């Protein structure tokens, strides 16, 4: 069944500032646009929810956050209604690319009123669970592949040093030159199709 975002969640705001979290030693986590910030003695949300960055850099980025936690004021709570799993709502919101609704040049913002009418297919709870499970598996595979790429990058750098050494030790006795010695700067090419 096609529904709107506003049919499956309520919005709420936070009055917490990042300074409210600094140097506190509470029990309940607080999150900001970049993730975990710290812990305080109270929480705003008793159930799992979705948070979206609504102000500043990273607008539209979403997080699925646990019960008994809070976010700071640059984020907005999207509180799932009884007809949707929090994780399913998270993937729906993430797939909508809500950053397209931004306004403001200096500090971009997005507002619930602008994206609340986005439509998607709401399936039954069993199907939601299946979809969430598949998407989590895909995300895990993507994370593993990205980790593997980082390791390959480190391997390439290490092999390069093994083959050519470093500038400081230059154990192979290579000539040390500046880029101007071995490259030509081409400022402007031909403005016609070359003839071969």
Language-model features: locations:
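Non-catalytic DNA-recognition/assembly elements of restriction-modification systems
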Residues: 1-16, 20-32, 119-132, 148-190
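Amphipathic alpha-helical coiled-coil segments
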Residues: 138-152
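A short beta-sheet element
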Residues: 32-94, 103-106, 111-115
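Short, flexible active-site-proximal loops enriched in glycine and acidic residues
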Residues: 86, 101-107, 123-131
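Charged, alpha-helix-forming regions
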Residues: 194-195
